[in-house]
């Protein structure tokens, strides 16, 4: 077999299909014109509207070499011969022009005549029910033993997203001859081995469209969509097993060797890192050139993940400063002639990469140290730890997955995703509000606010800065004028560490400023946001007054949170760690690591312990200590917090000791009463407790007492008999409902419903709308009616708060009609959903006004007017 470079293969492919009447088109952008896709993941993506029949093709035949990005198997990149995040897909496409015969014949011709691959090295696969494709391959001379029938999982392609064109496919494999395990008593084939037979070309016979519910619909025209991986073909044509050993990667790997002073193929572990960098730098280069920029959402986050994963592997190879931007040039030199956009954008790409590396490399080193401490302590990476590493140090989950895989650690990815979604939700809410809290304008002001709120709720201060509509002014005047003040001294606590900000008032000589929110945009500055009525000026003396009731309620809840944390560890075990908290005047919310829901007994024990500490009226002591000293003494530090050399320690005798900058009561007795109001799951391995203290607890108990009093009057029973009385009423209700349903069952006459039978093309069917019939009765009823008419039945039951749809299709009619699909379509009209088997299905809905429309749709389905 002759040797061919990747450039020669690419050109040979495109030229071959040009000669077959195909229009050669340039690669489309990696950013698809498709809201369902993050990136262009296959050669056919730019042509999806044509395959759908939504757009008429300009050319009936097209050939391309499409740049693609996929990151779904990113953890395998560098560890296997053929996984990549960026790759080039050669493709030839037919839009209602030729179909299977030509597609198969031309593919075989190109592989055997142009590439001159030995026929004895080639195998093919077909979809198990595609006899047409099987016969075409056989007539081309492929031995029957080398034509492998494979399942839908292997040989039915698409769609490239939740919806889109799809169809059966046929693949061409190259036999590398590599020794691999084979099932006992079987000869090796592409179906029963892994790693020996390399798929080099996939021919997709696109003839269906898959909708959002997974249903297949015939396309207006049959199409051909093929994909041949340039990297894989290059490996075969260059006589190597690993794609990374082809000329597509060699120049990039050489650049990595030079920049990082390492040698490829000298150390298996280092080789993985070199291959990861070689792959990822291609993705990064092309993504940025196509307009993707690093961010924390969408495509930008995918780019950031890939870039940071490459950076992590560089650090493993000894990199201590940015290096990836230096390797971009090797990608441009290798691929710039084919993709001129990366030549034009080279400088821009390098600057973006370097900037991103500078942001992350210091955090990476610190984060890796923390990961090591975590796994040394627990032997696993919890969802909480994973999220904190992501949130604090920018660690993508891929990096943690790599670390876990390399070292055999457990990683809670599902829990991490839950944390991430919660953060996104908070972010979405915050974006809808007016953003005063931007750092812009507060850096380098050369001023500082002294917080005195630990000791007093009132202070005399001077106004240092006034900000209105984002601009600093010398004075402000108005009614309900939104503005921000910075004081030299303040008793107002700025939101931090889970504790909400104080509220209150700031009084000037001629004005009153109502404090609604307090925050610290940069270290040392506290900003008061609120509304001004009257006048206020810079350098004016003002009186600050924190809302005492709210502050003291918050203090009670904050100290109670610390006590709760320790109580949880005593009752549940030392594995309990804080995973998040919120301290407000009205309640506290505490998230913690634990593997299961708390029992009623555990909740009672926790409440009792907390209340015992409260009743003992233990002094709450705060001290300033060095971080090392505090941790050495056993003070609990929170992973997400960034601590300085000296920290504030809040101690409740020997019961609780934590690093905390929040406000607390002087004595646990001030908390009054502690009551847990809910316990729930946040994510895998993380639970949440919500609780109240002080007067809020008393009000909670008073509300319960009032409820009991009402129940006593309604049930005419003493408090001790209320539960028994309710149980008796519920049992009576249940029995009455059974009696009602039995009466309904007897009143409904299946024979009368069966008389409504209609017929279309020898298919008998009945549709009937009933009132308040339960699902189990509907099932018996529909079986009876279907047996009577030997046909299809749709029953719709209007309940008080919902609609029940039941469909029955005789087995002999399921080739043309599917009960599950009918139920889905009908219930969708009714604003619901559901499904079932081809013979029986039930679904639900809620739009009673749409019942007529639903029955009309059913009749259209019977008449084949709707698929």
Swiss-Prot record:
<keyword id="KW-0820">tRNA-binding</keyword>
<keyword id="KW-0694">RNA-binding</keyword>
<keyword id="KW-0030">Aminoacyl-tRNA synthetase</keyword>
<dbReference type="InterPro" id="IPR018162">
    <property type="entry name" value="Ala-tRNA-ligase_IIc_anticod-bd"/>
</dbReference>
<comment type="function">
    <text>Catalyzes the attachment of alanine to tRNA(Ala) in a two-step reaction: alanine is first activated by ATP to form Ala-AMP and then transferred to the acceptor end of tRNA(Ala). Also edits incorrectly charged Ser-tRNA(Ala) and Gly-tRNA(Ala) via its editing domain.</text>
</comment>
<dbReference type="GO" id="GO:0008270">
    <property type="term" value="F:zinc ion binding"/>
</dbReference>
<dbReference type="GO" id="GO:0006419">
    <property type="term" value="P:alanyl-tRNA aminoacylation"/>
</dbReference>
<feature type="binding site">
    <location>
        <position position="562"/>
    </location>
    <ligand>
        <name>Zn(2+)</name>
    </ligand>
</feature>
<feature type="binding site">
    <location>
        <position position="660"/>
    </location>
    <ligand>
        <name>Zn(2+)</name>
    </ligand>
</feature>
<feature type="binding site">
    <location>
        <position position="664"/>
    </location>
    <ligand>
        <name>Zn(2+)</name>
    </ligand>
</feature>
<dbReference type="GO" id="GO:0000049">
    <property type="term" value="F:tRNA binding"/>
</dbReference>
<keyword id="KW-0436">Ligase</keyword>
<keyword id="KW-0963">Cytoplasm</keyword>
<dbReference type="GO" id="GO:0004813">
    <property type="term" value="F:alanine-tRNA ligase activity"/>
</dbReference>
<keyword id="KW-0547">Nucleotide-binding</keyword>
<dbReference type="InterPro" id="IPR045864">
    <property type="entry name" value="aa-tRNA-synth_II/BPL/LPL"/>
</dbReference>
<keyword id="KW-0648">Protein biosynthesis</keyword>
<dbReference type="GO" id="GO:0005829">
    <property type="term" value="C:cytosol"/>
</dbReference>
<dbReference type="GO" id="GO:0005524">
    <property type="term" value="F:ATP binding"/>
</dbReference>
<dbReference type="InterPro" id="IPR009000">
    <property type="entry name" value="Transl_B-barrel_sf"/>
</dbReference>
<dbReference type="InterPro" id="IPR002318">
    <property type="entry name" value="Ala-tRNA-lgiase_IIc"/>
</dbReference>
<dbReference type="InterPro" id="IPR023033">
    <property type="entry name" value="Ala_tRNA_ligase_euk/bac"/>
</dbReference>
<dbReference type="Pfam" id="PF02272">
    <property type="entry name" value="DHHA1"/>
</dbReference>
<feature type="binding site">
    <location>
        <position position="558"/>
    </location>
    <ligand>
        <name>Zn(2+)</name>
    </ligand>
</feature>
<dbReference type="InterPro" id="IPR018165">
    <property type="entry name" value="Ala-tRNA-synth_IIc_core"/>
</dbReference>
<dbReference type="InterPro" id="IPR050058">
    <property type="entry name" value="Ala-tRNA_ligase"/>
</dbReference>
<dbReference type="InterPro" id="IPR003156">
    <property type="entry name" value="DHHA1_dom"/>
</dbReference>
<dbReference type="InterPro" id="IPR018163">
    <property type="entry name" value="Thr/Ala-tRNA-synth_IIc_edit"/>
</dbReference>
<dbReference type="InterPro" id="IPR018164">
    <property type="entry name" value="Ala-tRNA-synth_IIc_N"/>
</dbReference>
<dbReference type="GO" id="GO:0002161">
    <property type="term" value="F:aminoacyl-tRNA deacylase activity"/>
</dbReference>
<dbReference type="Pfam" id="PF07973">
    <property type="entry name" value="tRNA_SAD"/>
</dbReference>
<comment type="similarity">
    <text>Belongs to the class-II aminoacyl-tRNA synthetase family.</text>
</comment>
<keyword id="KW-0862">Zinc</keyword>
<keyword id="KW-0067">ATP-binding</keyword>
<keyword id="KW-0479">Metal-binding</keyword>
<dbReference type="Pfam" id="PF01411">
    <property type="entry name" value="tRNA-synt_2c"/>
</dbReference>
<protein>
    <recommendedName>
        <fullName>Alanine--tRNA ligase</fullName>
        <ecNumber>6.1.1.7</ecNumber>
    </recommendedName>
</protein>
<dbReference type="InterPro" id="IPR012947">
    <property type="entry name" value="tRNA_SAD"/>
</dbReference>
């Amino acid at each position: 077999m002759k040797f061919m470079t990747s450039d020669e293969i690419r050109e040979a492919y495109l030229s071959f299909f040009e000669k077959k009447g195909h229009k050669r088109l340039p690669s489309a952008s990696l950013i698809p014109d498709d809201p369902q896709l993050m990136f262009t993941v296959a050669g056919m993506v730019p042509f999806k509207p044509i395959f759908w029949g939504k757009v008429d093709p300009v050319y009936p035949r097209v050939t391309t070499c499409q740049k693609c990005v996929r990151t779904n198997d990113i953890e395998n990149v560098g560890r296997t011969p053929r996984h990549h995040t960026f790759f080039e897909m050669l493709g030839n496409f037919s839009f209602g022009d030729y179909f299977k015969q030509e597609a198969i014949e031309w593919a075989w011709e190109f592989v055997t005549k142009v590439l001159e691959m030995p026929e004895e090295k080639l195998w093919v696969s077909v979809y198990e029910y595609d006899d047409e494709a099987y016969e075409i391959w056989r007539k081309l001379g492929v031995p029957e033993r080398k034509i492998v029938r494979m399942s839908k999982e292997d040989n039915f392609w698409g769609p490239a997203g939740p919806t889109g064109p799809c169809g059966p496919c046929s693949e061409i494999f190259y036999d590398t001859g590599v020794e691999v395990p084979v099932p006992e008593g079987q000869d090796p084939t592409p179906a029963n081995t892994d790693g020996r037979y390399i798929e080099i070309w996939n021919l997709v016979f696109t003839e269906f469209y898959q909708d959002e519910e997974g249903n297949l619909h015939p396309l207006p025209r049959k199409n051909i969509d093929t994909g041949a991986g340039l990297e894989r073909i290059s490996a075969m044509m260059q006589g190597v097993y690993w794609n990374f050993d082809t000329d597509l990667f060699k120049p990039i790997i050489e650049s990595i060797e030079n920049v990082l002073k390492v040698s490829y193929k000298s150390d298996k572990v280092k080789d993985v890192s070199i291959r990861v960098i070689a792959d990822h730098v291609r993705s990064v280069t092309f993504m940025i050139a196509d307009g993707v920029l690093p961010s924390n959402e969408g495509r930008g986050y995918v780019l950031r993940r890939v870039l940071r994963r490459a950076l992590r592997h560089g650090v493993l190879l000894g990199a201590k400063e940015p290096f990836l931007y230096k390797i971009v040039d090797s990608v441009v030199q290798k691929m710039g002639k084919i993709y001129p956009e990366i030549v034009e954008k080279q400088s821009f790409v390098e600057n973006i990469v370097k900037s991103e590396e500078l942001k992350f490399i210091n955090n990476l080193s610190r984060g890796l140290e923390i990961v090591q401490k975590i796994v040394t302590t627990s032997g696993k990476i919890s969802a909480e730890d994973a999220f904190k590493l992501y949130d604090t140090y920018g660690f993508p989950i891929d990096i943690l997955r790599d670390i876990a895989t390399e070292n055999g650690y457990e990683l809670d990815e599902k829990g991490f995703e839950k944390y991430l979604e919660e953060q996104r939700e908070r972010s979405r809410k915050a974006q809808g509000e007016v953003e005063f809290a931007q750092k812009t304008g507060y850096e380098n002001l050369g001023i500082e606010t002294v917080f005195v709120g630990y000791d007093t709720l009132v202070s005399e201060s001077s106004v240092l800065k006034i900000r209105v509509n984002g601009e600093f002014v010398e004075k402000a005047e108005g009614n309900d004028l939104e503005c921000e003040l910075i004081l030299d001294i303040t008793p107002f606590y700025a939101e931090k560490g889970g504790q909400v900000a104080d509220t209150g008032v700031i009084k000037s000589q001629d004005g009153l400023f109502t404090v609604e929110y307090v925050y610290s945009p940069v270290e040392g500055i506290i900003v008061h946001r609120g509304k001004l009525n009257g006048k206020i000026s810079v350098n004016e003396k003002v009186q600050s007054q924190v809302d005492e009731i709210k502050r003291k309620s918050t203090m009670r809840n904050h100290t109670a949170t610390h006590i709760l944390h320790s109580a949880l560890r005593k009752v549940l075990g030392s594995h309990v760690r804080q995973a998040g908290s919120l301290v407000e005047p009205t309640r506290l919310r505490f998230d913690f690591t634990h593997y299961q829901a708390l029992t009623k007994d555990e909740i009672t024990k926790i409440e009792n312990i907390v209340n015992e500490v409260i009743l003992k009226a233990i002094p709450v002591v705060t001290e300033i200590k060095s971080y090392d000293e505090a941790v050495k003494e056993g003070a609990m530090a929170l992973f997400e917090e960034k601590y300085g050399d000296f920290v504030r320690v809040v101690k409740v005798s020997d019961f609780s000791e934590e690093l905390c900058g929040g406000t607390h009561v002087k004595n646990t007795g001030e908390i009054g009463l502690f009551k847990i109001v809910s316990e729930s799951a946040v994510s895998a391995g993380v639970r949440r407790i919500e609780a109240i203290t002080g007067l809020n607890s008393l009000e909670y108990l008073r509300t319960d007492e009032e409820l009991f009093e009402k129940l006593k009057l309604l049930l005419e029973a003493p408090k001790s008999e209320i539960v028994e009385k309710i149980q008796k009423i519920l049992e009576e209700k249940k029995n009455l409902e059974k009696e009602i349903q039995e009466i309904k069952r007897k009143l409904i006459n299946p024979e009368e419903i069966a008389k409504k039978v209609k017929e279309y093309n020898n298919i008998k069917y009945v549709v009937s709308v009933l009132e308040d019939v339960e699902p189990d009765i509907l099932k018996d009823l529909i079986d009876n009616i279907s047996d009577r008419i030997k046909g299809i039945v749709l029953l719709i039951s209007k309940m008080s708060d919902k609609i029940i749809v039941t469909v029955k299709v005789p087995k002999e009619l399921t080739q043309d009609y599917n009960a599950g699909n009918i139920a889905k379509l009908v219930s969708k009209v009714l604003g619901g959903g559901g499904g079932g088997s081809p013979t029986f299905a039930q679904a639900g809905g809620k739009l009673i006004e749409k019942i007529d429309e639903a029955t009309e749709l059913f009749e259209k389905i019977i008449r084949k007017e709707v698929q």
